[in-house]
Amino acid sequence: MSDQESSFAADLVDAPLEAANPAPTRKRPKPGERRIQILQTLAAMLEQPGADRITTAALAAQMSISEAALYRHFASKAQMYEGLIEFIEQSVYSLAVQITGRDVPDPAKTVQQGIAQAHRVVAMVLQFGERNPGMVRVMLGDALQSENPRLQQRMQQFFERIETTLRQCLRVAPGADTSATPTVDANVRSSVLMSFLIGRLQRFARSDFRRLPTEQLDSCLSLMAH
C-alpha cells in the first residue's frame, strides 16, 4: 500500500467514507489526492440502492472527469476495489489487535473472558460495516461479482482470518475450562458467531442498509454466550 493510501485508511478507521467534495477553487488535486477521491466516490456510490455493479463510466461521470483520468491513477477497476479491500483489512485487523492486545490472542484467560473478547471482535466488525455501508457490498462480494476472482478470494480470506481470531479468543489455558472438549467448543462457538456476523451484514445489505447490523446486538450476543 502506498503512503497516500495508508494515510487514507488511517484517517478513516473510525469514520465512514464519504463522497469526495474537492474545493471548487482548486483546479488540480495534490499528488495522490485524486486516488483517494476516486476510492471515496466509489465507496459512496456503493451505498446507493442497487449499486452492486458500478461501471468506470458511471464513476467518472459522478466525479465529472473522464474515464482516461481514472486510468491515470488505477490500472483497472479491480485495482480500485483492491484499494477498498486494503482499507477494510487495515481497519478491521488493526482494531482486532487492539481488542485482543496482540496478533494472536492470549489463551491464558477464563472461558467468560474469552467469550467477552470474541463478542467485542464481532461487535467491532458489525460497527465498521454500519459506519461504512458501501464497504459491506465489497466485504460480501456483491460488488465483486464481475471482477477478477482473486478479489472474491481475498474477501473470503478476510472472513477466514476473522473466524480464526474468534477461535483463538475462545481457546483457554489448560485447566481453565471444565469442558471435556474445550477445543471443539471453541470451534463451534466461533462458527456460530461467524455465521451471525455474516448474516447480519447480509441483512444490512439486502435491506438497502435500513436494518442495522448492530440492532439488539448485546441481547443477541448474550443469548449466544450460554
Label the model's feature ranges.
Residues 1-22, 127, 131, 164-172, ...:
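C-terminal peripheral helix-coil segments that are non-catalytic and often amphipathic
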Residues 27-34:
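Short, Lys/Arg-enriched anionic-surface-contact patches
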Residues 31, 81, 85, 89, ...:
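Amphipathic, non-transmembrane alpha-helical scaffold segments
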Residues 37, 41, 45-79, 83:
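Helix-turn-helix
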Residues 55, 137-139, 179, 205, ...:
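Short, hydrophobic secondary-structure boundary micro-motifs
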Residues 83, 97-131, 186-193:
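Hydrophobic alpha-helical connector segments
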Residues 93-97, 149-176, 184-191, 214-222:
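Amphipathic alpha-helical packing segments from all-alpha helical-bundle domains
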Residues 129-150, 202:
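Amphipathic alpha-helical segments used for helix-helix packing
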